[in-house]
Amino acid sequence: MRVLTIIPTYNEIESLPLTLGRLRDAVPESDVLVVDDASPDGTGDWADTRAAEDPSVHVLHRTTKDGLGGAYIAGFRWGLERGYDVLVEMDADGSHQPEQLPRLLEAVRTADLVIGSRRVPGGKMVNWPTSRKMISWAGSLYPRIMLGLNLTDITAGYRAYRADTLRAIDLDAIESKGYGFQVDMTFRTARLGKRIVEVPITFVERELGESKMSGGIVGEAVVNVTRWGLAARWEGLRARLGL
């Protein structure tokens, strides 16, 4: 099973060396693709140097910063073109524990999409205040209700996709740039009838660098989820009425 772990970066020079080192130690059989959006802090240059030393590390440079979704889609296309069997999403900031990747890879042997969940039994969040946990919970509950998805952590970004799952999705139709991208991909996977499994992970708040979350990203996600949910309900109503 050929595995590619995709790590999007923008100004992650403090975090990426630690995360990449841990990943190579924990799962040496996984190749790594760093997708850098022209980081002005030298992240891309550092990644190039590491790739020159390690043939399992690759770098994809993009000229503009156009969001998490665009970076992952570029990474998916790169990996699919090169015949990888499983494509993993992982944050550069250390929030996703590389040492827990084996449990995602084991689960994806019998699933189409595996989500590392903070909310299933055994999952947890570290260094998050209660207020942040409540906001995150609400952010996951809303799409769960609107889209009818029986999952605990729809917005989670630690994931493993089978290549066939990604090939079945029209990646050109993905609209979300920010964290709504995770909801978009989950919804499309579910509508294809694919098997989605959640496994527990420990999510640790970043200690280095700056978060990329913003009000605009949250707003985009809310608007899109509402639109998708209403459209799905309308489709269901038309089908029942024979329209």
From Swiss-Prot:
* Alphabetized GO MF terms: all-trans-undecaprenyl-phosphate mannosyltransferase activity; dolichyl-phosphate beta-D-mannosyltransferase activity
Q: Which residues cross the membrane?
A: none
Under which EC number(s) is this enzyme classified? 2.4.1.54
One Pfam match, given by its short name, reads Glycos_transf_2
Which CDD domains does UniProt cross-reference here? Answer: DPM1_like
Biological process (GO), any one: glycolipid biosynthetic process
What is one cellular component GO term in this UniProt entry? membrane
Q: Which reaction does it catalyse?
A: di-trans,octa-cis-undecaprenyl phosphate + GDP-alpha-D-mannose = D-mannosyl di-trans,octa-cis-undecaprenyl phosphate + GDP
* Keywords attached to this entry: Glycosyltransferase, Transferase
Q: Which InterPro entries match?
A: DPM1-like (IPR039528), Glyco_trans_2-like (IPR001173), Nucleotide-diphossugar_trans (IPR029044)
Q: Which domain of life is it from?
A: Bacteria
Q: Which Gene3D superfamilies match?
A: Spore Coat Polysaccharide Biosynthesis Protein SpsA, Chain A
SUPFAM superfamilies per the UniProt record, alphabetical: Nucleotide-diphospho-sugar transferases
The UniProt similarity line reads:
Belongs to the glycosyltransferase 2 family.
User: What is the role of the protein in this entry?
Assistant: Catalyzes the transfer of mannose from GDP-mannose to D-mannosyl-1-phosphoundecaprenol.
Q: Please report the name of this protein according to its UniProt entry.
A: Undecaprenyl-phosphate mannosyltransferase
Q: Which organism is it from?
A: Micrococcus luteus (strain ATCC 4698 / DSM 20030 / JCM 1464 / CCM 169 / CCUG 5858 / IAM 1056 / NBRC 3333 / NCIMB 9278 / NCTC 2665 / VKM Ac-2230) (Micrococcus lysodeikticus)
